[in-house]
Structure formats: C-alpha cells, structure tokens
Amino acid sequence: MGTSINFNEKKGFICDMDGVIYHGNRILPGVAEFIQWLHEENKEYLFLTNNSGYTPRELNQKLARMGLDVPEEHFYTSALATAAFLREQAPGCSVFAIGEAGLLNALYDAGITMNDVNPDYVVVGEGRSYSLDTLTKATNLVMQGAKLIGANSDVSGPCLLYTSDAADERS
C-alpha cells in the first residue's frame, strides 16, 4: 500500500508547465483550483519549463489568456538557468545564440555579450524557425573552438497532433 501525502504540510511546490499546468493553449483540469489554493494557503511555488523560448512575462501573459493569474517571479525557464550557468562559470564570456526572446533576453540580462565572429559559446535554445545559414554558422563556430550549450536537451518538443480529419474540420 502506498503512503498518502498531506499537501497541507508542504511549504512549497515546484511544477513543470507543459503537460502539467497546460497542454497547448488549454489549462488542464484542476489547475485553476490548485493555483487558487496555493495563493489562499500562502504556499511558495515555482513553475519550471525547459522551453527556453519564453520570458517569464510571456509565460505570465500566456497563462493570463487562459484565465490564470501567476506573477512573473513564479516562473523559471531553461533560458534563465543557462544564462545563470554562463554568468557563474564563465563571467565575461560571449555567445552566438540561436533561439527566441526568452533565451536572448536571459543572456542579455545576465550581462553576456552576443558575438557572431569568435564566441566562447554557441547556445542553442527553443526556436520556431532555424535557417540553414544560422545552423551552418553555429556549426562552423563550434568547429573553430566555441563550446556548444543546449538550453534544452529534449530530442523533441511537446506539441499538439492533428489527424487529417481534425485538420479538415478546422478548414
């Protein structure tokens, strides 16, 4: 028999986002009540995501569009973790970054310089559009000595799948 967990005794919670809080643009069942309970009980909480593409502000707005009020300080992304790692391990370093606003803003905010000629690191994050030119540039920079860092080690990202029938219905 398993042991039951008394959540009231817990001081705080760390939750993944995609697939736990929402899927696509839909809040999952029970999430609104859970967040309300966290606030009512003054519980500490942090939402983690390994998606480096979003800033905490964008995540705040995404959840707001779904009807949830979660302040920006309750989000921590892989972009923020990557930027903190570089700031601590290689102060003053420069990077060639491939990714969205979440990654670029986190790197800038950490005082990391962008460099597309001879960077110390090539940092690859979540992106909606990678070009062959950008990937070739990144590959060449790594071959010339830049260290490669992935802001997310997933081999694939979560996505909504549509069958051909569902696609026909949306047309």
Describe the function of each predicted region.
Residues T3-I5, G111-D120:
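Short acidic low-complexity segments
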Residues E9-G24:
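Asp-based phosphoryl-transfer active-site loop
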Residues Y162-S171:
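Single conserved hydrophobic/aromatic residue that forms the stacking wall/gate
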Residues H23-L46, Y54-E58, E72-Q89, A101, ...:
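Short, acidic loop-to-helix structural element flanking the phosphoryl-transfer center
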Residues L63-L80, S164:
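Structural recognition of alpha->loop->beta junctions
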Residues E88-A110:
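Short, charged N-terminal beta->alpha structural module
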Residues N118-Y130:
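Short, well-ordered secondary-structure micro-motifs within conserved domains or adaptor modules
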